[in-house]
């Protein structure tokens, strides 16, 4: 219903009743607009030429002051929602989430079908829309981000002028149960037949809300440790045992009250057959983390890189930036919405250990996705085939896992810059490279950054082969060679990537191209 309401707000207001008037104003002034509905908020955003910005604010604010909810266009917007739903029918991520939500806590909002369709919205009345609008759309539950070349004082005047009329209904923020996975002393397994030919294993754990711990970043700490790819990492051992080709750990804050952490493993064919061994290794790594002290050096490394990235990274602009900041307003104060990823305080291991303590066998839901897995049921909305089982005996086995000495915390990262400062030199438009070496078989150019003055370096190497050797067989062998080199370097290169360094080693038209980019300095 929230998603459908998002669509209906674009259908005219009392001040601008034309159903396409808002969109036409955007198009006429080089702009575009969009919106999305998440689990706990709806986010409206747009960008437009600067000279039309105040006019757009006047029109946009009316969405939240006097929308028409034009009944004659209800069917059109239902079909638009249906179209969004249909385009994702073969999206494996959507299909997987729809199935996983079937096994969440009954009645929890995380169980709800989020997109909507003609079937689920067909009986929605205009009164229901208005009731929902009045129950949730209130000035005290809204946030506004403006970005323009106008002075901040002018933007403040415009904000008051156009948005002050939004009614404040004094509606409290909605609260949600923090545990959407019911604790069960059993191994819960979902098996899904995918559309694409993929093999993945996902371990999901629900977490309590942790927005107030943004200075200690416990979610980011867990992600970076579990998802590490260096020596002693979970992925390193999975690769050595030929069980996986990749691994991603992610934590997210769905609402102020709850979040989740998931470990997604890309399986080899052997890993698919031995998926239970993969589960054991994942839990063994978590056991190792729970038995270890919080790695203070790792926190300091993340804090250092966050400080560097705040200064030197591209922050984005336009609709993407304001949408991101407005989304942060749901969980963070206005003063920090643009700095949340970069803000670190002193190390506080308590929030880290609290989240880590929630990675338990009892609140774990495992999803195995691959062609040919046994299925018994069909999900209603996406038609995906799946099966669900519980195994108390395997759960007991998982509670008594032996430690694996191969699994350990990552070493201190030697690539983290100890100190980086802005280069002290004058800006100049003279950016032509200088040829410093010109010998048979070797040409070297150097170009000094005199424009952006960032403490970054870029090294580019090209190893050229005689064109007569670059036949199809040679290119295939070269591709295999570069793939093997990249794989063999991954454990070394991963800490470098964490330190803002990246490299590329790939075959090209003339031979092998090798590049290194990132922070320069000590």
What are these regions (language model features)?
Residues 106, 114, 143-199, 295, ...:
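An aromatic/glycine/proline-enriched structural segment found at the starts
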Residues 132, 154-156, 167, 211-215, ...:
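Short helix/loop capping segments that flank catalytic or ligand/cofactor-binding pockets
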Residues 197-226, 232:
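Extended catalytic-interface subdomain
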Residues 39-43, 76-83:
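Short, structured secondary-structure elements
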Residues 9-14, 27, 31, 61-69, ...:
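Sec-exported extracytoplasmic/periplasmic mature domains
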Residues 1-4, 19-63, 94-119, 141-147, ...:
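M16 family metallopeptidases and their MPP-like homologs
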Residues 145, 297-450, 459:
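C-terminal regions of mature proteins
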């Amino acid at each position: 219903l929230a998603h459908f309401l998002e669509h209906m707000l674009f259908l005219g207001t009392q001040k601008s009743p034309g159903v396409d008037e808002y969109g036409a104003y955007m198009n006429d002034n080089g702009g575009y607009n969009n919106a999305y509905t998440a689990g706990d908020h709806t986010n409206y955003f747009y960008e437009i030429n600067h000279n039309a910005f105040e006019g757009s604010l006047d029109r946009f604010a009316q969405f939240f002051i006097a929308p028409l909810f034009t009944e004659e266009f209800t069917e059109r917007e239902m079909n638009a929602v249906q179209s969004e739903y249909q385009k994702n029918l073969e999206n494996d991520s959507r299909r997987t989430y729809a199935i996983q939500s079937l096994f969440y806590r009954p009645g929890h909002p995380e169980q709800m079908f989020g997109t909507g369709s003609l079937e689920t919205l067909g009986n929605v009345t205009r009164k229901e829309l208005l009731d929902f609008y009045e129950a949730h759309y209130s000035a005290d539950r809204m946030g506004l981000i403006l970005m323009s070349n106008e002075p901040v004082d002018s933007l403040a005047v415009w904000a008051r002028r156009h948005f002050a009329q939004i009614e404040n209904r004094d509606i409290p923020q909605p609260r949600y149960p923090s545990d959407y996975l019911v604790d069960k002393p059993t191994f819960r397994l979902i098996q899904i037949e995918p559309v694409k030919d993929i093999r993945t294993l996902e371990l999901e754990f629900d977490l309590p809300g942790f927005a107030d711990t943004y200075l200690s970043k416990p979610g980011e700490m867990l992600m970076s440790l579990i998802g590490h790819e260096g020596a002693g990492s979970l992925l390193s051992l999975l690769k050595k045992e030929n069980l996986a080709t990749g691994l991603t750990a992610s934590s997210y804050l769905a609402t102020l009250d709850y979040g989740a952490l998931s470990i997604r493993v890309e399986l080899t064919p052997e890993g698919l057959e031995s998926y239970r061994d993969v589960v054991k290794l994942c839990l063994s790594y978590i056991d190792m983390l729970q038995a270890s002290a919080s790695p203070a050096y790792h926190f300091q490394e993340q804090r250092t890189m966050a400080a560097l990235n705040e200064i030197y990274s591209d922050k984005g602009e336009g609709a993407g930036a304001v949408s991101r900041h407005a989304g942060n307003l749901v969980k963070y104060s206005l003063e920090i919405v643009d700095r949340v990823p970069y803000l670190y305080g002193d190390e506080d291991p308590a929030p880290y250990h609290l989240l880590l303590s929630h990675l338990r066998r009892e609140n774990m839901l495992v999803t195995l996705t691959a062609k040919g897995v046994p299925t018994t049921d069909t999900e209603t909305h996406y038609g995906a085939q799946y099966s669900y089982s519980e195994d108390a005996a395997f759960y007991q086995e998982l509670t008594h896992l032996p430690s694996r000495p191969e699994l350990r915390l990552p070493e201190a990262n030697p690539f983290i810059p100890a100190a980086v400062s802005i280069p002290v030199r004058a800006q100049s438009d003279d950016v032509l490279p200088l040829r410093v070496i010109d010998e048979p078989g070797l040409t070297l150019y150097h170009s000094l950054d005199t424009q952006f003055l960032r403490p970054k370096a870029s090294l580019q190497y090209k190893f050229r082969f005689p064109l007569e050797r670059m036949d199809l067989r040679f290119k295939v062998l070269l591709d295999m060679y570069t793939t093997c080199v990249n794989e063999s370097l991954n454990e070394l290169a991963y800490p470098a990537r964490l330190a803002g360094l990246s490299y590329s080693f790939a075959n090209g038209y003339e031979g092998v191209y090798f590049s290194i980019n990132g922070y320069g300095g000590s």
